[in-house]
A protein has these predicted regions:
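Alpha-helical transmembrane segments in inner-membrane proteins
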Residues: 1-311
């Protein structure tokens, strides 16, 4: 584990050193493209991927449901709706987008859990509740696009997901939420390990299960909302990464280690998806969210088909 983390960190360090040392002596246009286009875009994909991967892992562990993720649970759609509202109502206030996105994400997950509680708290009910809330929030987003086409003309790409045009102020505000959220998620790892023993056993060992589960869900919601603010509606990454890692490392790593790997591989997957989105049909660019949906939707169907086998 430590060797893997060291190797990833070393690779990332050498990559950024090569970028910044390569700027020395470069032409002015090249320097501007690297500094104000490529670097913010890559950093945005790294931060957003880490947040979505880690958020998906936290949700799955808190709800004991491997089908849970920010996109499936309606968190992404709720955050996206309120972030779009903030961009329309307060276009000059960057912080408003993050605050309203968090409120939208919190509203969505609250609706999902409320519906699931009323309908019978089971795995399938939680997933169906999330799909319903996602559809509701998605319809509201489409309504804004339909009724205010001129106001959202430059924001429609937000609904498809991507990092084109990302600037440093957005990165700064996202890092303010994502980095503490990642730290909080790592600190919650000990309690998540106890979740696996069952609520009664965890309670007997001194863990306040309700409070710890609430903190875990709030942390996951903050991470997902911040990721939506910089990358738009990128779905399925929080579902794919934790489940793939669980198939390889389940039972061999602690929750804190699995959380760390979910963030790292989420970053790697989103950076790779962003690269492919730019290169597959060059000079045209695919939305990153569309590319991940093409990968994630079949994976989600496969998960549903195998749920009775305990996956």
């Amino acid at each position: 584990m430590s060797a893997l983390l060291f190797g990833l960190a070393l690779t990332l360090l050498f990559t950024w050193f090569s970028v910044f040392f390569g700027l020395h002596g470069a032409a002015g246009d090249v320097r501007r493209i690297l500094c104000y286009v490529r670097v913010p875009r890559t950093l945005g994909a790294l931060l957003s991927g880490a947040a979505l991967g880690a958020s998906g892992y936290l949700m799955q562990e808190a709800l004991h449901n491997t089908l849970a993720s920010p996109s499936v649970m309606g968190v992404n759609a709720g955050a996206g709706l309120f972030a779009l509202l903030a961009a329309l109502l307060f276009p000059a206030v960057t912080a408003a987008r993050f605050v309203l996105a968090f409120l939208g994400a919190l509203l969505s997950i609250s609706l999902v859990l409320l519906i699931a509680r009323r309908a019978g708290y089971s795995r399938s009910v939680i997933v169906l509740s999330g799909v319903a809330v996602s559809a509701l929030m998605g319809a509201a987003v489409n309504g804004l696009v339909t009724f205010f086409p001129h106001a959202v003309a430059d924001k429609q790409a937000f609904t498809l997901g991507g990092f084109a045009g990302l600037q440093y102020d957005g990165l700064f505000f996202s890092a303010v939420f994502i980095l503490p959220g990642l730290l909080a998620g790592a600190l919650l790892g000990g309690g998540i390990d106890l979740f696996a023993l069952g609520d009664e056993v965890a309670q007997g060992l001194g863990l306040s299960v309700t409070r710890h589960r609430l903190l875990t869900m709030v942390t996951a919601t903050v991470l997902a909302a911040a990721a939506v603010c910089i990358g738009g509606l990128i779905g399925f990454l929080g579902l794919i990464v934790p489940n793939v890692l669980r198939r390889f490392f389940s039972g061999r790593m602690s929750a804190r280690q699995m959380f760390t790997l979910s963030g790292l591989y989420g970053s790697a997957l989103l950076v790779a998806a962003d690269f492919l989105a730019r290169r597959l049909f060059y000079p045209y660019e695919l939305p990153v969210g569309l590319l991940l949906s093409l990968l994630g939707a079949p994976f989600f169907i496969w998960m549903l088909m195998h749920r009775k086998r305990g996956i």
